[in-house]
C-alpha cells in the first residue's frame, strides 16, 4: 500500500506531501527528502538522454526494510515521490508507472488553473481526492 505521496518543486522544496499514518509523518518527510539525492543522481546520470526521452519514470529509487521508494520527474524538473509498503508484493512496476502518470495528469490540471501560482503549495480538493483514491487503490 502507498503510505506517502509527495510532489517536490524544481528547487527541492515540497509542494505537496500526503501520508496515510499521520503519526509517522515526520519519518515520511525525511524519507522523501533523502530520496531527492537519488533522484538527482539518476537525472544527472541520464544527462541529455532524459531530455529526449518521453518516459520520465525513474523506477525504484531505494528500498528500506519497511518501504520501497519510487520516483518520477517531469519535463519541468518537478519530482513525484511515492513511498510504498514493501509487504505489498502484488504491486507491479507498471502499476506504479500508471499511478505516476495519473498523478502527473492531475498536477498538469492544477498548473492549468489560472488561480494557481506555480511554485506555491498545492491546496486542491480534486488533487487530494485523486491522491486518496490512489492510496486506497493500492491497498
Swiss-Prot record:
Q: Does the keyword Cytoplasm apply?
A: yes
Q: What is its main location?
A: cytoplasm
Per the record, the GO terms for biological process are: endoplasmic reticulum to Golgi vesicle-mediated transport
Instruction: Please state where this protein is localized.
Output: Cytoplasm, Perinuclear region; Endoplasmic reticulum; Golgi apparatus
InterPro entries, per database record: Longin-like_dom_sf, Sedlin, TRAPPC2L
Top-level lineage group: Eukaryota
Which UniProt keywords are present, listed alphabetically? Answer: Cytoplasm, Endoplasmic reticulum, ER-Golgi transport, Golgi apparatus, Transport
GO CC annotation: endoplasmic reticulum; Golgi apparatus; perinuclear region of cytoplasm
A Pfam family of the record is Sedlin_N
> Its family?
Belongs to the TRAPP small subunits family. Sedlin subfamily.
PANTHER family on file = TRAFFICKING PROTEIN PARTICLE COMPLEX SUBUNIT 2
Q: What does this protein do?
A: May play a role in vesicular transport from endoplasmic reticulum to Golgi.
Q: What is this protein called?
A: Trafficking protein particle complex subunit 2-like protein
Q: Which organism is it from?
A: Taeniopygia guttata
Amino acid at each position: 500500500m502507498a503510505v506517502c505521496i509527495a510532489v517536490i518543486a524544481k528547487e527541492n522544496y515540497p509542494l505537496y506531501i500526503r501520508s496515510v499514518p499521520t503519526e509517522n509523518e515526520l519519518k515520511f518527510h525525511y524519507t522523501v527528502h533523502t530520496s531527492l539525492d537519488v533522484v538527482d543522481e539518476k537525472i544527472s546520470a541520464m544527462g541529455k538522454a532524459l531530455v529526449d526521452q518521453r518516459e520520465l519514470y525513474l523506477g525504484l529509487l531505494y528500498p528500506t526494510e519497511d518501504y520501497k521508494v519510487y520516483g518520477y520527474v517531469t519535463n519541468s524538473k518537478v519530482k513525484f515521490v511515492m513511498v510504498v509498503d514493501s509487504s505489498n508484493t502484488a504491486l507491479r512496476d507498471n502499476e506504479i508507472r500508471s499511478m505516476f502518470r495519473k498523478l502527473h495528469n492531475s498536477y498538469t490540471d492544477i498548473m492549468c488553473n489560472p488561480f494557481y501560482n506555480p511554485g506555491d503549495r498545492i491546496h486542491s480538493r480534486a488533487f487530494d481526492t485523486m491522491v486518496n483514491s490512489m492510496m486506497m487503490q493500492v491497498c
